[in-house]
Amino acid sequence: MDMQHRIRQLFQASIETKQQALEVLPPYIEQASLVMVNALLNEGKILSCGNGGSAGDAQHFSSELLNRFERERPSLPAVALTTDSSTITSIANDYSYNEVFSKQIRALGQPGDVLLAISTSGNSANVIQAIQAAHDREMLVVALTGRDGGGMASLLLPEDVEIRVPSKITARIQEVHLLAIHCLCDLIDRQLFGSEE
């Protein structure tokens, strides 16, 4: 097996998926940034959730807002619902793993807040329940999905935003999700604090 050849194949596949995403995602990423900025300007916050790699993405996004992205600026209110192991395990034990995010949203979410819901398949049951809870709390939803959008896509309201990666391969979807998250962080900073150029 030629490992360097395989590495080149993987790089090329990632590049091609990003090129395909570039053709379709910019308006949705822009709209998502506007939704998030509007919430932040109106004293709202952004909650985020996902499983596995998507949980890591939720935490990555939250940390970029709470700390900083690529410039010095005030901290922005963002909470990853994936980080408190005591809360997650108590809900999973006493109720169901499908409720680990929705119960947190019912406690922490307020009208005007935004939920960043991340799932490569769009079919994660606990993320689907998180979207339902967010709507119950009069929150808007930004969904990062892939494939056909799954069950998440069918739950979204007209004012919500879906950023659906045009791929069926989990690794490629995750790579574009990370790029979309970095785009959102950049656009949020620019809209709130101006361009550094």
UniProtKB/Swiss-Prot annotation:
Top-level EC class: isomerase
Catalysed conversion reaction: 2 D-sedoheptulose 7-phosphate = D-glycero-alpha-D-manno-heptose 7-phosphate + D-glycero-beta-D-manno-heptose 7-phosphate
Binding site for substrate: N51, G52, G53, E64, N93, D94, S119, T120, S121, S124, Q174
GO CC annotations on file: cytoplasm; DnaA-DiaA complex
Keywords: Carbohydrate metabolism, Cytoplasm, Isomerase, Lipopolysaccharide biosynthesis, Metal-binding, Zinc
Gene Ontology biological process terms in this record: D-glycero-D-manno-heptose 7-phosphate biosynthetic process; lipopolysaccharide core region biosynthetic process; positive regulation of DNA-templated DNA replication initiation
Coiled coil segments of this chain: none
InterPro entries linked to this entry: GmhA/DiaA, Phosphoheptose_Isoase, SIS_dom, SIS_dom_sf, SIS_GmhA/DiaA_subfam
Localization terms from the record: Cytoplasm
Cofactor(s) listed: Zn(2+)
All copies of domain SIS, residue ranges: 36-197
An example Gene Ontology molecular-function term: carbohydrate derivative binding
Residues that hold Zn(2+) according to the record: H60, E64, Q174, H182
Disulfide cysteine pairs (residue numbers): none
Pfam families reported in the protein's UniProt record: SIS_2
EC number(s) recorded for this UniProt protein: 5.3.1.28
Pathway assigned in UniProt: Carbohydrate biosynthesis; D-glycero-D-manno-heptose 7-phosphate biosynthesis; D-glycero-alpha-D-manno-heptose 7-phosphate and D-glycero-beta-D-manno-heptose 7-phosphate from sedoheptulose 7-phosphate: step 1/1; Bacterial outer membrane biogenesis; LPS core biosynthesis
Cofactor binding comment, as recorded: Binds 1 zinc ion per subunit.
Subunit: Homotetramer.
Family: Belongs to the SIS family. GmhA subfamily.
Cited HAMAP family: GmhA
Biological function: Catalyzes the isomerization of sedoheptulose 7-phosphate in D-glycero-D-manno-heptose 7-phosphate.
The name this protein goes by in its record: Phosphoheptose isomerase
Organism listed in the record: Pseudomonas aeruginosa (strain ATCC 15692 / DSM 22644 / CIP 104116 / JCM 14847 / LMG 12228 / 1C / PRS 101 / PAO1)
Taxonomic lineage: Bacteria, Pseudomonadati, Pseudomonadota, Gammaproteobacteria, Pseudomonadales
